[in-house]
Amino acid sequence: MFNLTDCNPSQREAVTFGEGPLLLLAGPGSGKTFTITKRILWLIHEKEVAPEQILVITFTREAALSMQQRFAQTSSFAGSVNFGTFHSIFYQILLRSGRVQPGNLLNEKQKLNLIYPILKKNKECSAEIAKSFLDAIAYYKNTGEKEKTLEKIPEEWKNCFPQIYREYESARTKVRGVDFDDMLKECEELLQNNTPQREYWQKRFSHILIDEFQDINYRQYCIVRLLAERHKNVFAVGDDDQAIYSFRGARPACMQMFVREFAATQILLRTNYRSHQDIVEASLLVINENLDRFPKILEASELNQRKEETYRGTACRVRIKEFRDAPEQMQYLLHRLKERSTQETCAILFRTNLAMQSVAARLGREGIPYVMKEKTRNIYEHFIVQDIMSYLRIAAGTAERIDFLRVINKPFRNISREAFGKHVSLQALEDYYSMKNNDYSADCNRKACEAIRLWKRQMEFVKNAEPKLAVTFVCKACGYERYLRQRANVENNEKTQEWEEILNYIVEEAGHFKTAKEWQEAQEAFGEQLRKGVARESGDNAQAADGAVRLLTVHASKGLEFDSVWIPDCNEKNFPHGNGLDPEHIEEERRIFYVAMTRAKKDLELLCLTGTAERPRFPSRFLIPLNRYRR
């Protein structure tokens, strides 16, 4: 007799579900991986399904490997069941058909090499613009949504997209290259138009199990529909409330489509084995504000429902804390991190990489150990920070040629690169335009001289100012902030908020140092930490690092859990991020906030800023249903 004693009633119902399509709605911490592996065992041992006919699809290689390893602990059939990502499965289908050859898969560098020459034929282009085009092409191939695709491209390039897309596809075809997104399109066409191939794969996979079904895109859904046409045994596991990848083309609406088109049965895994009841209740108050979702009634496991216990001196496990400004919020975080038990896991979750690095830099200075899961670009390598540091080096008289080249026309100063001799200085530039032995008009020489003299006076002030005042002066008085706004309008309006956040971060960070040299050394030390991996570990093992606090973006925290979680900056423009009022955008941002809240097992603190009378900050709208948790 198959053992089901370790299953709760909902899990048991899902595991022993008979033939046909099933949508298993799996709330946070509800044991979905356990249920999937138990289902595979039940199919093999009770329904006598051949392991080779079972296909288990995940969204990442790590998830596929993890699930296969979990299954291997309970069964000797792990090597026979087909575990893989959408892309790896579709690649095998295309290989068998001969539509792709081994070695034809294009990596990121190869794709950049294909698109660079095409872009440069049209206009000057940066690596950032090339990357935005590749992202847009991938999004378009996955979704076919032209309007949203164009949002990913700088404004001045939008009219060029159709032509550049055609030229890129032509170049890719010439080298017989295939990228991940082509595989979806090719696979769908193969299964639609090639009856023998379609029938072979339909017979091959009699049962299809899909994890994280809320992250599926429409093309992936269509391929699953083709594969499942014969048997219709699709076991789709997901939670539409945790759908946070629309920027990759994910469409949680496919879950509703699956229920309609397949007439799928629905089962809800309602018991949360991770979080205390207070956290479950608070997170539900937030997510219930979303309208476009499957309604759910969730509860904590019996063990997590004991409310009489106090934790850290309070009977409630969820608290909202308000602070006047970011430094006050940071002081509170430092205090909490220093007093916590190192035996417990804890994490600070951020909406953006920038906010995460700001806290990481401060923890490093305070000697508080931390790890970062995701590989993240060093903020000090961002062009804005590099520009600011070039200004400071010019003021200090330690600048090199590259520093002048970076900022001569940020903002525009009428200065040509031809004015640069072997040794560059502001005085040398002024001499070049003053002597008038160049090819420029008298008016042009006069304007350049005026700009350089003003620049010299500005740099004299910067030279004698402490870093925070110096950076503020460069941004405001020297016109660097104005230059960024103009550039954002030309390239991509979506960059405006990101660049504004970076400038605010630089000003705040500069305030921790007395000299530019001291600040430069701190930047180098932080960069060294990232390079050596002191501040970053990959994989779930990092969760158990001795006494270290985990720093993660919300997206990177998905699937993880911690005893204590802090979510700083629960303010408008951060949660939800940006200025968009589109209902779809707000609902996704609310889901992101929900995912962050549901990472907590025992203790959850939501931190927000109130600002000052002159510069008020507004708490996130997502906190409105949580007023009773204010402390």
Task: Show where each model-derived region lies.
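Conserved helicase core region in the C-terminal RecA-like lobe
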Residues: 82-92, 209-212, 237, 352, ...
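Accessory C-terminal helicase-associated subdomains
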Residues: 436-556, 577, 623
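Helicase P-loop NTPase motor core
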Residues: 24, 28-36, 40, 263-266, ...
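ATPase/helicase motor core of nucleic-acid motors
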Residues: 261, 314-315, 340-467
